[in-house]
Amino acid sequence: GVVPAELGADALGGAINLVTDKGTQDFLDASYSFGSFNTHRAALNTQVINKRTGLFMKLASFYNYSDNNYWMHSNPKYDAAIQVPDGNGNFVEKSVRRFHDQYQSGMIQAEVGFLNKSWADVLAISMLYNQHYKEYQTGARQSVVYGHVNRNGKYYMPSIRYKKSDFLTEGL
């Protein structure tokens, strides 16, 4: 169908316009889930606004973890065979549990600022911290097994957010 240009001129078949909540209320959202392969996911998000002063504080965070220790089986249809030494110098086909394939990631962002002031619709400073860790057992092909290879990283991202409608002139 016809799509307004502000949603994307090349949209084929339609578009979905997601309008996020501008966050004018206090809230606390928390979640936790547990799944197979010792998978854990947690999130905590909160916001507090002082209506009189316009001062607000936000916290957003999540943490994910998984052992990824699922069973791997041979699959002749795709010429995929898992072979392990049998102790006599031979290789035998066998189902094996993955090892050294752990994954974890986390993020926390804290923001403080002012809303609805004569000099700013929004003025806020924030700091974001993110970390991740991933172990690798194999590459793209299961035939090459690595020994204790992992990837990890951290980063910090400070930011300043400012918004003022009709800045210096109406409509700007």
PLM-predicted stretches and their roles:
Residues D29-Y32, E93-R98, R141-N150:
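Extracellular loop and loop/strand-boundary signature of outer-membrane beta-barrel proteins
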Residues T24, K154-Y156:
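Hydrophobic helices that insert into or interface with lipid environments
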Residues N38-S66, Y78-Y133, P158, K164:
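Transmembrane beta-barrel wall of Gram-negative outer-membrane proteins
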Residues Y156-D166, E170-L172:
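Long, internal scaffold/assembly segments composed of regular secondary structure
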Residues E6-G8, T24, S36-N38, T53, ...:
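Short glycine/serine/proline-enriched coil/turn segments at secondary-structure junctions
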Residues G1, E6-S33, H40-T46:
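N-terminal periplasmic accessory domains that precede
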Residues S74-Q83, G139-H148:
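Flexible, surface-exposed loop regions and adjacent strand-edge segments
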Residues G8, D67-M72:
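Switch/connector loops and helix/strand junctions flanking conserved nucleotide-binding motifs
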